[in-house]
């Protein structure tokens, strides 16, 4: 395996093709472990991982816990509701508390964009060597979700020998509430970075026309994009036209908790225009896999019938793949230190 040069994982804007390949190859090895009878590895024995989620989570939090334990790390999960946050403590001071207790890595989720990066910079300024892994921040980024989505797609397209090259030239649709989705932003970096074209599909209120500018230039402070030839990003308002052109579709939850205005007429009309069902998919000759980062609003983004058909709706496969992907990220961040 080639070298790994990231001290933290805040987003995927600085990921190279080599980085994506490293993560997916390692995740593939970790995924195969149970077949060999091994449930745990001593790779991170004696290391301390603190999971600091200042926002509710089921899949991400639990899979990080399982991933850390399968690598034999010591794990402590922070509970915001019973912490000193209720007394006015800041997320930075909470993080510093865990660093003082010896945490080697902090996995951080927060409802405000930029919090994991701010904590990483503060720790570096203080001379701390603790790694920060972003578990999702505001509307900004959710790198581990995008990587497990990529891993799921690669395994679908090339199940016998998964390879990052299998995604190149594919057209992947992202449908739904893109405006409020940190997952969509991270998926844009990973999919276009690996050579896929992306079609963004949704109502104008949830998908502004200028969203395609998101990956047109590196973010502030990053002068060079490590990917020379990214895939294209397009916008569509028609689900039917989008699916006709797509090799796979990632549909997104309507994030009502982040909507501060009336952006939709009603949920019924949204489902009729942008909801995905078995009936809609039957109109196309090729098999189109359906992904969703969860949690799913049944009958809104995906029909119940389709959601329960795991031969084509890969939501449970995504959940399974979250563990080896997060094992890979923790290992890459910590094994060389």
Swiss-Prot record:
A GO-annotated cellular component:
cytosol
Q: Does the keyword Transferase apply?
A: yes
Q: SUPFAM superfamilies in the record, alphabetically? A: Aspartate/ornithine carbamoyltransferase
Which InterPro entries does the annotation name? Answer: Asp/Orn_carbamoyltranf_P-bd, Asp/Orn_carbamoylTrfase, Asp/Orn_carbamoylTrfase_sf, Asp_carbamoyltransf, Asp_carbamoyltransf_Asp/Orn-bd
Quote one Gene Ontology molecular function term: amino acid binding
Question: Which pathway does UniProt place it in?
Answer: Pyrimidine metabolism; UMP biosynthesis via de novo pathway; (S)-dihydroorotate from bicarbonate: step 2/3
Q: Which GO terms describe its biological process?
A: 'de novo' pyrimidine nucleobase biosynthetic process; 'de novo' UMP biosynthetic process; amino acid metabolic process
- Which stretch is the leader sequence? none
Enzyme Commission number(s):
2.1.3.2
Pfam families hit by this protein: OTCace, OTCace_N
What reactions does this protein catalyze?
carbamoyl phosphate + L-aspartate = N-carbamoyl-L-aspartate + phosphate + H(+)
Keyword Transferase among UniProt keywords: yes
Q: Which residues bind carbamoyl phosphate?
A: 59-60, 109, 142, 145, 294-295
UniProt keyword terms in alphabetical order = Pyrimidine biosynthesis, Transferase
Q: Which residues bind L-aspartate?
A: 87, 182, 253
Q: Which family does it belong to?
A: Belongs to the aspartate/ornithine carbamoyltransferase superfamily. ATCase family.
Q: Which NCBIfam families match?
A: asp_carb_tr, PRK00856.1
Q: What function is annotated for this protein?
A: Catalyzes the condensation of carbamoyl phosphate and aspartate to form carbamoyl aspartate and inorganic phosphate, the committed step in the de novo pyrimidine nucleotide biosynthesis pathway.
Q: Which proteins does it associate with, and in what oligomeric form?
A: Heterododecamer (2C3:3R2) of six catalytic PyrB chains organized as two trimers (C3), and six regulatory PyrI chains organized as three dimers (R2).
Name of the protein this chain belongs to = Aspartate carbamoyltransferase catalytic subunit
Organism this protein belongs to: Prochlorococcus marinus (strain MIT 9211)
Annotated gene: pyrB
């Amino acid at each position: 395996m080639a070298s790994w040069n990231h001290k933290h994982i805040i987003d995927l804007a600085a990921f190279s093709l080599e980085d994506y390949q490293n993560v997916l190859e390692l995740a593939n090895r970790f995924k195969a472990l149970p077949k060999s009878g091994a449930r745990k590895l001593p790779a991170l024995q004696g290391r301390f991982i603190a999971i600091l989620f200042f926002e509710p989570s089921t899949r991400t939090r639990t899979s990080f816990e399982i991933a850390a334990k399968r690598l034999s790390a010591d794990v402590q999960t922070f509970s915001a509701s019973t912490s000193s946050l209720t007394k006015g403590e800041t997320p930075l001071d909470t993080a510093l508390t865990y660093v003082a207790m010896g945490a080697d890595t902090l996995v951080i989720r927060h409802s405000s964009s930029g919090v994991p990066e701010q904590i990483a910079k503060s720790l570096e300024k203080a001379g701390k060597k603790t790694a920060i892994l972003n578990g999702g921040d505001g509307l900004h980024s959710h790198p581990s979700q995008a990587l497990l989505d990529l891993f799921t797609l690669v395994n679908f397209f090339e199940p016998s020998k998964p390879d990052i090259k299998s995604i190149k030239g594919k057209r992947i649709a992202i449908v739904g509430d893109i405006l409020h989705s940190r997952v969509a932003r991270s998926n844009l970096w990973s999919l276009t970075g690996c050579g896929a074209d992306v079609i963004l599909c949704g109502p104008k209120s949830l998908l502004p026309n200028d969203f395609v500018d998101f990956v047109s230039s590196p973010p502030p402070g990053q002068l060079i994009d490590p990917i020379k030839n990214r895939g294209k990003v397009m916008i569509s308002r028609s689900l039917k036209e989008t699916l006709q052109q797509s090799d796979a579709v990632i549909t997104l939850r309507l994030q009502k908790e982040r909507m501060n205005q009336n952006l939709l007429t009603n949920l019924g009309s949204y489902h009729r225009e942008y909801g995905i069902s078995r009936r809609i998919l039957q109109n196309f000759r090729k098999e189109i896999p359906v992904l969703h980062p969860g949690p799913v609003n049944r009958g809104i983004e995906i029909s119940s019938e389709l959601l329960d058909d795991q031969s084509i709706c890969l939501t449970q496969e995504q959940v399974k793949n979250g563990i080896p992907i997060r094992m890979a990220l923790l290992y890459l961040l910590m094994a060389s230190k």
